[in-house]
Amino acid sequence: MPLSFSLTPADKTFLGHQARTAIEAGLAGVYSSTPPAPPQGLPDDVLTRSLGAFVTLTINHGLRGCIGNIIGHEALYATVWHLAAAAAFQDPRFPPLT
């Protein structure tokens, strides 16, 4: 059965904020493996679905980190949180962000 969904502008804003916050927490040395939950009242539950994702970091249009999963293992908001930190600090092709 095909999976169909779309992200709302509010979902995209939240996920972008989630990724930036995870990286900022890692840079500050206060990263937690427990991500902040999405705000109540978003129109769809797509952020809580178990979905795969990729987080790609670029600096000056060049690849700086990319980590992802094609299969979901946890809620999308948590996946983005963990993958953002992994792309910033654990991509074996690049030194960790500082």
Residue ranges and their predicted role:
Residues M1-T98:
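Basic nucleic-acid-binding interfaces
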